[in-house]
């Protein structure tokens, strides 16, 4: 046997949404900042993403991250998130998964009842409180980056619907278009997942053609990357139910941590949520995240919040992926 590359990764899922976490076997990722490292991956090491996210090793809805070093003295490590379509600046479910893996595999020393971890992503520093009981991670609470309502009641003509829709654009680590399902004439149900995917990608691409967004402090964040469609909950314990569409038509199986942060910021700015008030977001699969507003802050001229998201993650496998130089599909493929 002769292989040109061997990549080590740990698989986990956070409330149903996968995270394949690369922990070794790739070249050094150069860059002073995490945004620089993200750009270096895009330009020089994108085969890692395509090989692990795409078939035959992955699938259309695979999600992952790469653990790397950070130049931030507060951070235990750096993290860069990825999916089938590219790289993300922040991911809530991915942060919960990475924190769980870091503690349960000994990357970070386990401390009961709470292990504190700081991770740096391109969007900023993520603080995680890992709840540990009998040497097992029970749940993780992440303090996300400052989140804010960027544009309220935006309008967009959607050709496939033959109508103009109204929605909000909010930041929760990435920019989200947040749309009530009734605006689209759909329900957030697994039986409607195909139409939800189609509409989500159509709307995201139209927004990026028609509407300019720019994070006031992070120059590299200037597109709406995800569409969050929300509805009334199925579970009486939940406040709302959602589905997030991203990448190349991927469907988040979890309630989406960054999407929950963006929703918290939206509700708080509109006066529909108070500091420390209970908020529960249900996913299209029925799993749930707890969210709360910790405090107010500012991002440039925008009123913002510091959100906390709580959920659970579980390790599902330890992988040593190999790449055969003679394999015509060695770096993955999509259909």
Curated annotation (Swiss-Prot):
Enzyme superclass (EC): isomerase
Record-annotated active site: 91 (proton acceptor), 256 (proton donor)
Swiss-Prot/TrEMBL catalytic activity: L-proline = D-proline
EC number: 5.1.1.4
Protein origin, superkingdom: Bacteria
Pfam families linked to this entry: Pro_racemase
Keywords recorded for this protein, A-Z: Isomerase
Keyword Isomerase: yes
Any one GO molecular function term: 4-hydroxyproline epimerase activity
Record text on activity regulation: Inhibited by pyrrole-2-carboxylate in vitro.
Purpose: Catalyzes the reversible interconversion of L- and D-proline. Likely functions as the proline racemase necessary for D-proline generation in order to discriminate it from the L-proline used for protein synthesis.
Similarity comment text for this entry: Belongs to the proline racemase family.
Alphabetized NCBIfam families for the sequence: PRK13969.1 (NF010576)
Further information: Differs from other amino acid racemases in that no requirement for pyridoxal phosphate could be shown.
Protein known as: Proline racemase
Native organism: Acetoanaerobium sticklandii (strain ATCC 12662 / DSM 519 / JCM 1433 / CCUG 9281 / NCIMB 10654 / HF)
Gene: prdF
